Amino acid sequence: MRRAWAVAAVAGAVALMSCGGSSTTSKAAWTAKHGAALAALNADLDTARATLSTLQRPDILGSCTQLRDSLLEARKGLPVPDPPADAALRTGFDAVDVGIEDCIQGARGPNIPQLEKSFRTLREADTLMEVATRTIDNWK
């Protein structure tokens, strides 16, 4: 699965480099409206990843539920007017979503293998969100 995420990230990066876009909404306007939600998502992603390491089910369930709420709020920023940034952000969001579901189900279980899978998936999601952040930073 890790290899699949890496391949998807590389393929996405290549596709992003070949795309251009014009937008009616400026980067500054989009960031002013949605930047706080994106920052909250990234912070909650870090918290969820750290909490998974503790193996404390109530804490894991709480942090992954908070991450789910942050993801729902951050998705309100889609579509991003810049096609490369939009594609990168959607890829990151999808990865976070997969990790959240495994996290919540594993914490409710308890299902240690599912929590381990969530940890790996959220680590990959963190990398994809970093790519998305850099892509947004490069938006002209």
Annotate each PLM feature.
Residues 25-140:
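Alpha-helical segments in soluble extracytoplasmic regions
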